Structure formats: C-alpha cells, structure tokens
C-alpha cells in the first residue's frame, strides 16, 4: 500500500510551526508495513487543497490529511474533502456529547455554532474519536482510496493515531518488524563497504545504516504477519552479516556492542557493572566530568558509582590524585603515563573496582606537541593498569570530548566481558 501525508496549515508554510506530525505518522505507517511515498504541505486554501487531494488520490492508496479540523472559517479540511468526494457532512453524536460536556464544564449553556464544525464527519466515514481535544477525525474509502482526516495538534493527533487509526489499519496489513544493531569502532563508510553485496541485493529483510556521533547503527526490517516469523528472518540476516569481516579482517560481531533504538555504550556498560557487582570511578581532564555525567544518567547509578574527580589542570592532578608533579611534568599531561596514573589513583582513593583516567587535547590548538583530538584513556583494576591512545581527528571540541567517553565506556565494557569469559 502506498501512502501520502498532507499537512494542512498556512502556519507550516510560513515556518511558524514545525511539521512533527509527518515524522510521527511516517514511523507509525512503517510499523504497519505501509510505505509512505509522498509528503505534502498546503495552506488553508480550498482551491489548492482540492488540487493536492486530487493529485494524491491518483497516485496513493492511503491519503492522510492532518490539520484544519478546528472551529474557525480557515479550518476547511473536512469540508474540502467532502466536496471532492461529493459527500455531505453529518453530525457525530459522540463528538457532540463531548462538546456539550466541555461547554458545561466551562459553565456555558450550549456549544456555539462554529464549534459544531468540530463534531462533523464526512458521510459514510468511520469516526476517529478525539481523547484529548474536541475535533473528531474520520476514515473513509472511496473508489479504492482510503482517506483519513486527523487533527493538527500533536497532543490530539498522536493518541488518535495510536488508539483509533492504527487498529483499523493493522487489521489488513502485515506489520513491519525492526531490529537495531549498534556498532562501535567502525565508520559508516567502512561498514557499508563490508556489507556492500548484502545491501545492493537486499529485498526483504532490508538493511539501513545510520551514522551517529562516534558510532553506527544498522536497522534490519522485515514485513511479516507475526513476531515469530519476523524473528526467524531477522535472526538469519543478523547471523549472516555478523560473520562478515571488515577491510582490516575483523568480524563484525566483535564490533557489535548492543541492540535497540535507545541503547548506548554508557547504558550497556552500566548494566554490565550492575550485573557483575563491580564499582567504577573516573578522573577526567579533557572530558571534564562528561563520562561521570553519562554514567549517572541512569537510575540506580549509586550501585556502581561512588564518586570521581575532575582534574583539569596539572596542579589539580597532583593535588587531588596524589600524582607527583615532577612525574607529570616529565611525562606530560597528554600521555599514557598520566592517563594510567589518573585511573589507578582514582580507583585507590575511592576503593572502586575499576578506575578510568581521561586526558588529551580537545582542540582546536595542539598541546605538548600533540595534535588536537589526541586522547589517552587509562583503565585500572586491582591487578592491572593499561591505557589506550586514540586520535579523533577533524572533529569539534564537543565531539572529541564525547567520542573520548565512548572509547572509555567501550574499554570498560570489554574488560567486564573478558572477566566473564564472554569476549
């Protein structure tokens, strides 16, 4: 089924509001296995709206109109669609009762004539009741094309779509099931190159790569009648792609860190720390507390984190962490020595199981003859201290600092998995 979204409202065309409804509806249609091919915005003008509806009806099976259901004269979506379809407008009793209750609550004796427009419905439509507003929506199929009218305010549109529209549409369509795989340590272009043949010849399931700051996700999607069938297809595709090797001969499964739309390296690390019963601390220089801030975003962070340090200057590294100033000056702030000492001292001072040290050059200028983007990350446990050097080139200060924390979380994650013989 091909769908088209039509946003009605001059305020969209003038930039007064952002059309967030289009994104929401596109996501919902995708979940239902309905392909959105076109999105259009049109002002509050009957002639132009008639033209847009006519074009949509010739190329789409499902036409969804949003906005223009209110009580004013420029709210003309239902009236215009009724005119196009040659249908009358009728009064919906349930919506009318809601109007009466609304005005009674406001101590007004009767609804006003213009407000009655909000309870009107195109003759022959299925009513889509409005749980959070007054304007009733509707669904009608004419000559093989299904038309849907929805209110414009997102607070009204979203509940109507979820509770009224989706159940009607889902009864006749296979749903779209998706699985999101999250990778760290590989760029989007490298990942796409590794998966070139799979992506080039894909049909169903499909593979869609997305780049985020410092990481890449793959969305695997399939249309299926039920979850079990979808899982079978997605499992097969995942097994196939994770066995593929990158240009430097790494299997992709070693770069996979988790699943899910809202997952992150910080969350994965946090959950591993909780599961293992281990605690962590950090001493941060260039990241200035960003690592600790991400860790404490999660409820229950106190189970794994007691406290940490922000030691931005060389003097504070010596004073707060007890690292000899002469050694810091000899090795340099931007060095593996300093990162390891920061991690080890922070761990000892807080009696934590794991210590992280972050030091480097956020930029844009170099420091100690080290180019911008140079980062050293130390990791200390009771039995071992190690460090990692990464160069995050061509990035802003903000990106360098954030990506540095991703490398730190990944170090901790891998160390925890190794301790459980899972890596």
Curated annotation (Swiss-Prot):
Pfam families recorded: CinA, CinA_KH, MoCF_biosynth
Segments crossing the lipid bilayer: none
Entry-linked SUPFAM superfamilies: CinA-like (SSF142433), Molybdenum cofactor biosynthesis proteins (SSF53218)
NCBIfam families, per database record: cinA_nterm (TIGR00200), molyb_syn (TIGR00177), PncC_domain (TIGR00199), PRK00549.1 (NF001813)
Family to which this protein belongs: Belongs to the CinA family.
Name the record gives this protein: Putative competence-damage inducible protein
Name of the coding gene: cinA
